[in-house]
């Protein structure tokens, strides 16, 4: 139970980055919200926000993947340098969805050779089948919003800082000579987890805030 609570705590902190400020995310050092549709040639522009539903084919995903592939690397956060870097040349490999969309995401991204056995319709070609990991985010309550993320091993977007590890520390005062046990037959447990979560970079992250 304590281990699951620790996992849910980490999940909650990361999920909140995508949903705070009505889905725009936190304000970055460049003055722009994490997710916005402003061009990169403008201060604070991240051009990583759309409003298209995930759908039942790859139209929406292709648009997001292409936009992320073309995003320019940071040269300098100063006038005259905005949006002048080289394209990052990376496509997303993770699709984050609420529980309401996980079936639709799996229908798009499970390996096509598994589709007959799993009774999942092959809605399109094998272009993305087996190349994208659909992940349901328990804390997301909006049934239509979704996000795309580049493999964090290639370019991390969210960073987790920890002391003593991500796994919670569990302390038990259950010895027969502990005061609580000796006096009151109580076995006391303390769970401790030191974490900090923040945005490392907007380039690997893209959000679709869908109306409805």
Q: What spans do the regions from the language model cover?
A:
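Alpha-helical scaffold segments that mediate packing/assembly in large oligomeric complexes
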Residues: 1-74
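Sequence/fold signature of self-assembling virion shell proteins
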Residues: 42-78, 91-94, 99-212
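Short gly/pro-enriched beta-turn/loop segments at secondary-structure junctions
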Residues: 83-92
């Amino acid at each position: 139970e304590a281990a699951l609570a620790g996992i849910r705590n980490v999940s909650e902190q990361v999920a909140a980055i995508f949903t705070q400020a009505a889905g725009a995310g936190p304000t970055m050092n460049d003055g722009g919200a994490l997710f916005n549709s402003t061009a990169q040639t403008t201060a604070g522009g991240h051009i990583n926000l759309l409003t298209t539903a995930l759908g039942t084919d790859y139209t929406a995903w292709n648009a997001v993947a292409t936009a992320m592939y073309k995003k320019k690397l940071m040269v300098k956060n100063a006038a005259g340098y905005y949006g002048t870097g080289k394209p990052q040349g990376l496509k997303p490999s993770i699709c984050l969805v609420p529980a309401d969309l996980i079936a639709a995401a799996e229908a798009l991204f499970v390996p096509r050779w598994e589709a007959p056995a799993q009774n999942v319709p092959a809605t399109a070609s094998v272009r993305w089948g087996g190349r994208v990991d659909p992940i349901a985010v328990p804390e997301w309550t909006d049934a239509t919003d979704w996000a795309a993320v580049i493999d964090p091993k290639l370019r991390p977007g969210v960073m987790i800082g920890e002391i003593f590890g991500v796994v919670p520390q569990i302390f038990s005062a259950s010895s027969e000579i502990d005061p609580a046990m000796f006096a009151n037959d109580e076995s006391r447990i303390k769970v401790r987890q030191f974490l900090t979560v923040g945005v490392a970079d907007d380039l690997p992250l893209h959000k679709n805030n869908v109306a409805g």
